[in-house]
Amino acid sequence: MLLALRHPRLWLVSGWLLIIGAVIANLMPSHDLPSLGGISDKTEHIVGYGVLSLWFAGIYPRTRYPMIGVALLVMGVVIEGLQGAMKLGRQADLRDVYANVVGIVCGLTLALIWFGGWAQRIEALTRKQ
């Protein structure tokens, strides 16, 4: 169950578009990927999974945070397995999974500290105008 939001579909569809984008980016042949200015692969994983976990923590209640973490972890493991199986210039790397976990933990920790439910706060700000 989502938080009480005025635009739940907007937030949920946007989150799923982020997921789809992450899956596509992780399964594209490595030579097709744009350069991100020397940012390490592990940093990309940490930031990406941090953003995903924080996004979903913004639209789901705290009781769902463990499920968000598990779902993103499973997604990351499946993607790494597919990278190894697809033979498109990508390879499975257990260190990527570890980086994903760091990102998930960072995102959910930020959500627990203050950023959880951010979508409700944004909607409240737009309601006042």
Q: At which residue positions do the language-model features occur?
A:
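Bulky hydrophobic segments
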Residues: 1-94, 101, 105-129
